[in-house]
Amino acid sequence: FAFGFYPEAERWRAWMVLVTPPLLLLLAMAPDFPGRRKVLVGGFCAYPVLAFALLAGGVLGLAAVPSEKWGGLLLTMVVGIGAFVFSFPIAILLALGRASKLPAIRLIATGFIEFWRGMPLIAILFMSVIMLPLFLPPGVEFPRLTLAMTGITLYSAAYLAEVARGGLQSVGRGQSEAANALGFGFWAMQGYIIMPQALRAVLPGIVNSAISLLKDTTYVMVVGLFDLLNIVTAALSDPAWLGLATEGYVFVGLVF
């Protein structure tokens, strides 16, 4: 259930990927730990890249493991956390674009958000994993996991953008006027004054979006990826697991 088809000899790498997020959270909650917020933010930003390099291998003498062998709780964590981290900066840009005074930028951002929010996630996965490869040039192929994560990332970015836009609207106009009076440029004003207040105001909404995204990762089973739920379903066809369906689904329920 935890690792899917990941090679047993290389599962120490999978263990490192699974235990890193809880360790980061514990460090962030330690009151006496210096720079705990920087560790939390920096750790989760670097986590998807480092996790992918560690799991895929092919670097630093690590044996290469194709993404087709990733599965179970491991795949659920990689897709959920990876898609959230990659979608967050896109969502910030979309929120700023939708609040822009420039009509062209506002129209593009609004169109992007409304398009992806209006598409069911299952349809997005089907188009990105099944249909998109049909239009690629011969010899150009991408792993199904990469295509699925791309679709989920764009889908998540559209919803997070609306959460971030709500935070921007909660910040008083006087904040930006004061920043302009002090000589702050647009990006400095957003980075140091506006965005920290906006994100703090909508932190519960961001957490809800992250939890919802983690649960939505179960949809990858429709494109043949063995996430936690799909690996349990597949294991029940093994004679060794006959009669243990309840235990498997209870475990999935506890995780989610």
Task: List each language-model region with its residue ranges.
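Transmembrane alpha-helices and adjacent helix-loop boundaries
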Residues: 1-256
